[in-house]
Amino acid sequence: MDPGTEEYELNGDLRPGSPGSPDASPPRWGLRNRPINVNHYANKKSAAESMLDIALLMANASQLKAVVEQGNEFAFFVPLVVLISISLVLQIGVGVLLIFLVKYDLNNPAKHAKLDFLNNLATGLVFIIVVVNIFITAFGVQKPVMDVAPRQ
């Protein structure tokens, strides 16, 4: 018995064209049936997260500008400046963390524990950023509406 026959016997009938073989079904979405490149997937995911982080960073910078323009007379000036500053610092930290996550090779089993820790850390920091931004939204950054009509 040759090794090729044993493989077919152990795994079922996987000869090209047989039912259930990768060659029997047409590829979905025009792609070939091949294993997922984990590094490529992780890099795309990190790039998407980085873009969202940049968008939130820009929004927080705009909010900080609006709060500073309102000045000290705004009721929630200090809490908003502190919360927005915390959010900005955490976002920069997550951005740097994502750069390190993209840098490492996921196929190296020796680095799996470190990558898992960094990924969990990034997820935790993103959760904290979301909570901080919920409070920023609750305090509000909009300018108060001024009465146009004179009071009598």
From Swiss-Prot:
Residues carrying the site annotation Cleavage: L56, L57
Biased composition (Acidic residues): 1-10
Residue ranges of the region described as Disordered: 1-30
Organism phylogeny: Eukaryota, Metazoa, Chordata, Craniata, Vertebrata
Keyword Ligase: no
InterPro entries the record matches: Ninjurin (IPR007007)
Ranges of Low complexity composition bias in the record: 16-27
The protein, known as: Ninjurin-1
Keywords noted in UniProt: Acetylation, Angiogenesis, Cell adhesion, Cell membrane, Cytolysis, Glycoprotein, Inflammatory response, Membrane, Phosphoprotein, Secreted, Synapse, Transmembrane, Transmembrane helix
Positions annotated as glycosylated: N60
GO BP field: angiogenesis; cell adhesion; cellular hyperosmotic response; cytolysis; ferroptosis; heterotypic cell-cell adhesion; hyaloid vascular plexus regression; inflammatory response
TM helices/strands, residue ranges: 79-103, 114-138
